[in-house]
Amino acid sequence: MADTQIYYLFKRVALRFSIFIGLLLLFLFSCTSQKENKLLLHADSLMAEYPDSALIFLESIPFPQKLSCADRALYALLLTQARYKNYITLDDDSLIKVAVDYYGKKKSLRAAQAHYYWGAAYRDMAVSY
């Protein structure tokens, strides 16, 4: 009888621990800031007609190095695109290289855009030398 009580006690403690861990993980993931992601998506929606506003939105993001990998790649792509559309010379390829490295050889619009702006950066670098 004592063995079954210990078993059920252990099972109850394990269940509570599992619930605690689940809630803790849920809390941690829900506390990540979505503000930057919303700004990225908003900047993307403005890019075609208002690239100057998109540039302002992108430059308002504090500490872009703290973004997730996906958001950092999108940030790099959009910031390069905004600079290009605002006729700001792309002096080096370090920013767009983040997007190129992330999107890699994926067959997507973002990968194509990253490679396009990477080429534009190389063109601007060749002209400036």
Tell where the protein language model's regions lie, with residue ranges:
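N-terminal secretory signal peptides that target proteins for export/translocation
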Residues: M1-L15
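Bacterial N-terminal signal peptides
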Residues: S18-L28
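A "functional boundary" signal
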Residues: Y7-Y8, C31-Y129
